[in-house]
């Protein structure tokens, strides 16, 4: 008996530009895609508000990237900071490196994942008997130059969250076993989502996420009806729905590509940087991550809107998401919705508004 296996097409993804009512979450994801050094985003909100749908939708819209063919780490064919040691040594020997274009990958990290599954494993027996570094790549290798998504991140083991955040911040994953060490690039946008009713992350871990997006269930009945209709249309005929939003998707993709190009040249005036740091000081934010992330996010926002210089509007659009999860609070309090940050912002920027 012969079984014919046909290659199935990729499952259609709900178009990013069709998602309505969750603008803060969409903006946070977009800015992290433009500048991954912002440090990722944690999205907390009610069940059934489209968190997972939106995250998968942003991945589908991203431009393709060049990678070294058959490389498990998605190494860049030219950029030494984004390639594995093996590819680098091949280039230094003068070998020809074939490359292909590939869609940006989105890797799901399951809650039950072990450290070996996340980081990868070294075959100690092979290393000792044959003298070669036999490495089985983990999820961090697959996520290099892509998006790593952790649903219900607040339920993930703290030790694993630490590993993810360390790799996201340094851009490298190092695996050490029995005196053998292997490292590979792990530059990814870390996106976590969860329901605050199921528990919050520790403040030390929360602070490591660049941005915090808070989403609530849409209450406006007309908007709710619109969302339900859109979803029903997509489920009934995905290809027709995708065709409807094709031009908007293409335009959005071009805006991201252009923003990534101009980002290095975007300027943020010294006076505005001083005011951002004043806000962080007034809010009693620990450390300097708040200042750094706000500066980066404001520049990314300016680039996304085609500007060469950051304005007050750019800072206003991002500062709440950059700081709300860094405020000191009592253990029984929930994370501030943003009213404290906005009040201090308005006080310090009053003369420029």
From Swiss-Prot:
Any one annotated GO CC term: chloroplast
Binding sites annotated in the UniProt record for ATP: 45-52
**Ranges in a coiled coil:** none
Where located? Plastid, Chloroplast
UniProt keyword annotation of Hydrolase present: no
| EC number assigned by the record | 6.6.1.1
Q: Which GO terms describe its biological process?
A: chlorophyll biosynthetic process; photosynthesis
The molecular function terms of the Gene Ontology recorded here are:
ATP binding; ATP hydrolysis activity; magnesium chelatase activity
This protein's pathway: Porphyrin-containing compound metabolism; chlorophyll biosynthesis
Q: What keywords tag this UniProt record?
A: ATP-binding, Chlorophyll biosynthesis, Chloroplast, Ligase, Nucleotide-binding, Photosynthesis, Plastid
Identify the InterPro entries for this entry.
AAA+_ATPase (IPR003593), CHLI-like (IPR045006), ChlI/MoxR_AAA_lid (IPR041628), Mg_chelatase_ATPase-isu (IPR011775), Mg_chelatse_chII-like_cat_dom (IPR000523), P-loop_NTPase (IPR027417)
Where does the secretion signal sit in this chain? none
Keyword Ligase applies: yes
Q: Give me the reactions it catalyses.
A: protoporphyrin IX + Mg(2+) + ATP + H2O = Mg-protoporphyrin IX + ADP + phosphate + 3 H(+)
Alphabetical list of Pfam families matching this protein = AAA_lid_2, Mg_chelatase
Which family is this protein grouped under?
A: Belongs to the Mg-chelatase subunits D/I family.
The cross-references to PANTHER family, in alphabetical order and at most eight, read: MAGNESIUM-CHELATASE SUBUNIT CHLI, MAGNESIUM-CHELATASE SUBUNIT CHLI-2, CHLOROPLASTIC
The UniProt function text for this chain reads: Involved in chlorophyll biosynthesis; introduces a magnesium ion into protoporphyrin IX to yield Mg-protoporphyrin IX.
Indicate what this protein is called per its UniProt record: Magnesium-chelatase subunit ChlI
Gene from which the chain derives: chlI
């Amino acid at each position: 008996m012969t079984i014919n296996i046909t290659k199935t097409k990729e499952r259609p993804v709900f178009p990013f530009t069709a998602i309505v009512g969750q603008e803060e979450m969409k903006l946070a994801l977009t800015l992290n895609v433009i500048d991954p050094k912002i440090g990722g985003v944690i999205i907390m909100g009610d069940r059934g508000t489209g968190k997972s749908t939106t995250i998968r939708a942003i991945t589908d819209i991203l431009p393709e990237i060049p990678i070294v063919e058959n490389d498990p780490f998605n190494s860049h064919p030219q950029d030494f900071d984004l390639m594995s040691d093996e590819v680098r040594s091949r280039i230094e020997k003068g070998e020809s490196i074939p490359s292909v274009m590939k869609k940006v990958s989105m890797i799901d990290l399951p809650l039950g994942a072990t450290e070996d599954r996340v980081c990868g494993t070294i075959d100690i027996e092979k290393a000792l008997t044959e003298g070669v570094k036999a490495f089985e790549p983990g999820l961090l290798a697959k996520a290099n130059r892509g998006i790593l998504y952790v649903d219900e991140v607040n339920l993930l083991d703290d030790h694993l969250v630490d590993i993810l955040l360390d790799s996201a911040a340094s851009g490298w994953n190092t695996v050490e076993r029995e005196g053998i060490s292997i490292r590979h690039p792990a530059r990814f946008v870390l996106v976590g989502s969860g329901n605050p009713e199921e528990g919050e992350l520790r403040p030390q871990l929360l602070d490591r996420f660049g941005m915090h997006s808070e989403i609530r269930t849409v209450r406006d009945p007309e908007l709710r009806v619109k969302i339900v209709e859109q979803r029903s249309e997509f489920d009934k005929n995905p290809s027709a729905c995708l065709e409807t939003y094709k031009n908007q998707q293409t335009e959005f993709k071009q805006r991201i590509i252009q923003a990534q190009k101009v980002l290095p040249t975007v300027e943020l005036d010294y006076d505005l940087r001083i005011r951002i740091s004043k806000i962080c000081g007034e809010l009693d934010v620990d450390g300097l991550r708040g200042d750094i992330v706000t500066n980066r996010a404001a520049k990314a926002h300016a680039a996304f809107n085609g500007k060469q210089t950051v304005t007050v509007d750019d800072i206003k659009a991002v500062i709440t998401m950059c700081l709300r999860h860094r405020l000191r609070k009592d253990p029984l309090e929930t994370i501030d919705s943003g009213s404290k940050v906005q009040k201090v912002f308005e006080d310090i920027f009053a003369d420029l508004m």
